[in-house]
Amino acid sequence: MSTAPGLLRQELSCPLCLQLFDAPVTAECGHSFCRACLIRVAGEPADDGTVACPCCQASTRPQALSTNLQLARLVEGLAQVPQGHCEEHLDPLSIYCEQDRTLVCGVCASLGSHRGHRLLPAAEAHARLKTQLPQQKAQLQEACMRKEKSVAVLEHQLVEVEETVRQFRGAVGEQLGKMRMFLAALESSLDREAERVRGEAGVALRRELSSLNSYLEQLRQMEKVLEEVADKPQTEFLMKFCLVTSRLQKILSESPPPARLDIQLPVISDDFKFQVWKKMFRALMPELEELTFDPSSAHPSLVVSASGRRVECSEQKAPPAGEDTCQFDKTVAVVAKQLLSQGEHYWEVEVGDKPRWALGVMAADASRRGRLHAVPSQGLWLLGLRDGKILEAHVEAKEPRALRTPERPPARIGLYLSFADGVLTFYDASNTDALTPLFSFHERLPGPVYPMFDVCWHDKGKNSQPLLLVGPDSEQA
């Protein structure tokens, strides 16, 4: 069977320059190129001396490739055929086969393998196909724009990696600052992890950049080829048009996928700190907040001490609440004077053997009038004790959620609030050397909050014990 006219020339043409091979080399993946074209398009080799194959992105070493002598001899033989003539019949290529998208001679068209195909005179085919160039050029330009945007995104992600690691190191330094000497080993470990992530992310992103830049070079090269082909004479245009179109569609179909960046670093959060607390007890806990009760917010039955750190429910009949909406009129509660709006905070409340209480935070704009529905949607995040033994979390439900009953109810409650992490955690702080987690709300607070203290009704003296704020100086009264 004879070879179809033009097919041999197509097979012996470099996919990068679209010319007959010049010093052809065959990569390890099987694709062949002019040696100079491969070196030019592949760019600088990686550390291991390899470059990506422009056709399939497989790794190859261009300097180690020897000239493909078999291809070179075929090219040399084909070069003897006059330009624009049939390789089989040596007649002028004057007819265009639409079915096979190639130029053929009159013999191929009437008697050869293209007999019965859809055929056009070369001049008519030239005029018709040339009108398709603007659309193909537009596709190429659009592909260039998309990949240029991808390059910009990757470069921005490289900056984000640096910024993420910088913020992470700052958080590590802030959390471990007070105990830096003791925790040097931990900080070193975290720093190495950050360096590893930055290194791996950087290598991955630079690899993607290299691949995209190589792909962009192919697109730009094709754009130049299109411009050159557009100005070629009829015969040469038709000979190269199919090669250009085929190569263009192949390049567009081999667009590298967008990079996905997944930075995984330990989160400096409540969980992270609790693991450290188990070894360091309270060493890394934020300093105790110097909170004081706000008498103007207290229910009329509550008595706040002069120091502002003690509050109890009086058994004497209290006057009705005033019209000040900042004051609780039904719930026997009080808030702190201090408004919390950012950062992290830790405070402790001595509850002693008080059988009923509730503690937590209250949204600054939450209502304090009437019977309160203590759930997060109403701006209340509370943990309480009922009947001297049942711990309850006031979650979003009709009834509070009963927690695991401790062997002994906590005598002191620690509350940790982190706005950045969206965490409010309650601890049993009865043991001065350890913190035992009781419950956590995991949600970002919608705005500033006040520490809230529901003293609860005195219950005819059964629940008259006070709540005491534990201060940095350990004075509670």
Curated annotation (Swiss-Prot):
Positions bearing Phosphoserine: 255
Recorded family membership: Belongs to the TRIM/RBCC family.
Residues involved in Zn(2+) 3 binding: 86, 89, 105, 108
Domain annotation B30.2/SPRY: ranges: 271-475
EC category name: transferase
Organism placement in taxonomy: Eukaryota, Metazoa, Chordata, Craniata, Vertebrata
Positions contributing to Zn(2+) 2 binding: 29, 31, 53, 56
Modified residues (S-nitrosocysteine): 144
Zn-finger (RING-type) residues: 14-57
Keyword Membrane (UniProt): yes
Entry keywords, A to Z: Cell membrane, Coiled coil, Cytoplasmic vesicle, Disulfide bond, Exocytosis, Membrane, Metal-binding, Phosphoprotein, S-nitrosylation, Transferase, Transport, Ubl conjugation pathway, Zinc, Zinc-finger
Binding-site positions, Zn(2+) 1: 14, 17, 34, 37
Official protein name in the record: Tripartite motif-containing protein 72
Keyword Lipid biosynthesis part of the UniProt annotation: no
EC numbers for this chain: 2.3.2.27
Pathway assigned to this chain's UniProt record: Protein modification; protein ubiquitination
Assembly, per entry: Homodimer. Homooligomer; disulfide-linked. Oligomerizes on the phospholipid membrane. Interacts with DYSF and CAV3.
Protein activity control: Specifically binds phosphatidylserine. The binding to phospholipids enhances ubiquitination activity.
The species this protein was found in: Rattus norvegicus
Residues annotated for Zn(2+) 4 binding in this entry: 97, 100, 114, 117
